[in-house]
């Protein structure tokens, strides 16, 4: 069996990290067994679907490296849905309804008032339909036995179908709702595993009966706990979680992937530089039932770790600044975003403004400039400079911080020994002199 998964977004808005996490889970499950990951664009809602959102979804997945083996669009599959709908109708599993939303709301309130579940009440067979009213269509659930399955995350699941309303599958205007087309597609595309959020658990119960009604074996099901942020449930309106915002913040795709792959599991977050390594450790058995908390600070930390551990070859295509492998290795331990390299290159090769210097440090820095000018820079100039300056009686922070500030304009950064050698004699002496004046 070839493991085949799918990610099925609706192009009614941009993706957020909750969507991305679902796409990633499906990609990793397929990748770890050499299977296929598909993209299905759920654009049955022709009024709300937008082509620009389709383009953005594809671009976001491409940026993340989650490239599908194939892409299908539901709007191009209506004939197939019609055929399967007709079969279900002929079998008596689909029936017409004519209630208005207002009538359904009254029915619901009456049931709640009687302390009964607000389940749709089927009309008696043969009940007359009002003239001139276009019907919508419901799938008739089979009440004869419970709906059960072994969920790959939640364990054994059991639903009583009599406590679930027969779902509307088609609107009065003929347009399709989510449930039935999704099942038809999963059958046609030979989907073996459906991984999605726990908010789809009841949908899955209903859809299992649809698979059976269409004479098809269902896929394996896995429902993960939802991703939540400090503000609460994630949504497409939570702008800080959009791919564009994350990219603008300098977040690398594998930092985001590494974090999202482990959120909600018992496994620690381990930053990986490629999806193949990430797939090797992906295990649905480690997922818990509690909501997974998304914290942008954790994304930043994952980004920092990624850059600190990635080799130049692994990150070179993402670097906009012109930088050598040697310089990247020198600087990478002190950046949280690749965009910070540009400022560090100024430290190495640019003209920095003279550092602000305390009066008590001016003579010390003038002496440092004089010593630095006389050193043999083919050796270890930092060690020799520090040793010579200890004769001033300075030590520790009083010795090293004024030098670092004068030479780099910063209070922290890479080790000074390799950094000073890379800055070079002429530039270093000039900066020390400038800071002493």
Residue ranges of each PLM-predicted region?
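C-terminal accessory/binding modules appended to enzymatic or scaffolding proteins
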Residues: 312, 358-407, 411
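Active-site cores that bind ATP or allylic diphosphates and position pyrophosphate for catalysis
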Residues: 96, 100-223, 228-234, 242, ...
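N-terminal Rossmann-like or analogous alpha/beta NTP/dinucleotide-binding catalytic cores
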Residues: 1-116, 203-216
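Short, histidine-centered active-site or binding-site loop motifs used for metal coordination
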Residues: 7-11, 41-43, 184, 188, ...
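Residue-level detector of short coil/turn "hinge" positions at structural boundaries
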Residues: 68-69, 95-96, 218, 253, ...
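Short amphipathic alpha-helical segments and their helix-coil junctions
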Residues: 1-6, 243, 276-282, 317, ...
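Residue-level signal for inorganic ion chemistry
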Residues: 16, 26, 57, 88, ...
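Catalytic adenosine-cofactor/nucleotide-binding cores of aminoacyl-tRNA synthetases and other
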Residues: 214-353, 408-437
């Amino acid at each position: 069996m070839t493991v085949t998964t799918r990610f099925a977004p609706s192009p009614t808005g941009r993706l957020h990290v909750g969507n991305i996490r679902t796409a990633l889970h499906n990609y990793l499950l397929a990748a770890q067994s050499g299977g296929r990951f598909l993209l299905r664009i759920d654009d049955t809602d022709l009024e709300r679907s937008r082509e620009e959102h389709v383009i953005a979804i594809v671009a976001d997945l491409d940026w993340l490296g989650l490239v599908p083996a194939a892409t299908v669009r539901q709007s191009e599959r209506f004939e197939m849905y019609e055929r399967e709908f007709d079969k279900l109708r002929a079998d008596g599993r689909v029936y017409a309804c004519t209630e208005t939303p207002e009538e359904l709301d009254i029915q619901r309130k009456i049931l709640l008032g009687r302390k009964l579940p607000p389940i749709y009440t089927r009309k008696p067979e043969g009940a007359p339909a009002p003239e001139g009213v276009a019907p919508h269509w419901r799938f008739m659930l089979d009440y004869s036995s419970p709906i059960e399955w072994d969920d790959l995350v939640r364990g054994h699941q059991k639903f009583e179908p009599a406590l679930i309303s027969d779902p509307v599958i088609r609107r009065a205007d003929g347009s399709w709702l989510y449930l039935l087309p999704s099942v038809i597609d999963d059958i046609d595309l030979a989907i073996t595993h459906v991984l999605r959020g726990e908010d789809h658990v009841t949908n899955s119960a209903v859809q299992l009966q649809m698979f059976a009604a269409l004479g098809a074996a269902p896929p394996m099901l896995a429902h993960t706990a939802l991703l939540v942020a400090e503000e609460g449930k994630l949504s497409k309106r939570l702008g800080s979680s959009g791919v564009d915002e994350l990219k603008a913040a300098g977040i690398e795709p594998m930092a985001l992937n590494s974090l999202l792959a482990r959120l909600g599991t018992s496994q620690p977050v381990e930053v990986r530089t490629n999806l193949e390594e990430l797939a090797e450790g992906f295990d649905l058995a480690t997922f818990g039932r509690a909501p997974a908390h998304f914290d942008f600070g954790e994304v930043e930390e994952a980004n920092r770790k990624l850059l600190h551990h990635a080799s130049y070859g692994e990150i070179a295509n993402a670097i906009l600044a012109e930088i050598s492998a040697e310089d990247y290795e020198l600087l990478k331990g002190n950046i949280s975003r690749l965009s910070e390299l540009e400022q560090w290159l100024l430290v190495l090769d640019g003209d920095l403004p003279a550092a602000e210097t305390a009066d008590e440090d001016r003579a010390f820095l003038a002496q440092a400039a004089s010593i630095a000018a006389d050193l043999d820079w083919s050796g270890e100039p930092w060690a020799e400079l520090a040793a010579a300056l200890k004769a001033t009686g300075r030590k520790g922070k009083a010795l090293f911080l004024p030098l670092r500030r004068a030479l780099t304009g910063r209070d922290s950064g890479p080790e000074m020994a390799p950094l000073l050698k890379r800055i070079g004699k002429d530039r270093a002496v000039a900066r020390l002199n400038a800071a002493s004046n």
